[in-house]
Amino acid sequence: MEIRVFRQEDFEEVITLWERCDLLRPWNDPEMDIERKMNHDVSLFLVAEVNGEVVGTVMGGYDGHRGSAYYLGVHPEFRGRGIANALLNRLEKKLIARGCPKIQINVPEDNDMVLGMYERLGYEHADMLSLGKRLIEDEEY
């Protein structure tokens, strides 16, 4: 397995992977999300590749105060092999190298499988309520 930075030629394969991982939401246009990331610190957008196939992703961010991780997904046929752990570990190292003191991840409360993985990796539940406000309406995907 190789973990590397996203490249333009990964575009369609990544969107297909996100569909398989059930990461797409009607209110988010994944093509726009990728375009936006490519224009703003693509070095934190990582893919895991096995035998030339993209099997995992994580899209990281850092605002100078906190890091974040989005679009963490692993192809269903490749789960249980430590790929998500490796992606998060690499992202964490990149954030630490920038002086990032903390990373936050938003997870649906009912996603027990993923919550368990994050807890095993040392993530703790923060008594915070995540609020959001859409500033630009994407077309429904």
Swiss-Prot record:
Which PANTHER family does this UniProt record tie to the protein?
Answer: AMINOALKYLPHOSPHONATE N-ACETYLTRANSFERASE-RELATED-RELATED
Catalytic activity, EC:
2.3.1.-
PROSITE patterns with a match to the protein in the record: GNAT
InterPro entries given for it?
Acetyltransferase_YpeA, Acyl_CoA_acyltransferase, Bact_Acetyltransf, GNAT_dom
Mind telling me what this protein is named?
Acetyltransferase YpeA
> Is-annotated flag, keyword Acyltransferase?
yes
Native species: Shigella boydii serotype 4 (strain Sb227)
Signal sequence annotation: none
Q: Which family does it belong to?
A: Belongs to the acetyltransferase family. YpeA subfamily.
What superkingdom does the record give? Bacteria
Q: N-acetyltransferase domain: which residues?
A: 1-141
Its lineage reads:
Bacteria, Pseudomonadati, Pseudomonadota, Gammaproteobacteria, Enterobacterales
Q: What class of enzyme is it?
A: transferase
Q: Which UniProt keywords apply?
A: Acyltransferase, Transferase
Write down the Pfam families for this protein, in alphabetical order.
Answer: Acetyltransf_1 (PF00583)
Keyword check for Transferase, yes or no: yes
Single GO molecular function: acyltransferase activity, transferring groups other than amino-acyl groups
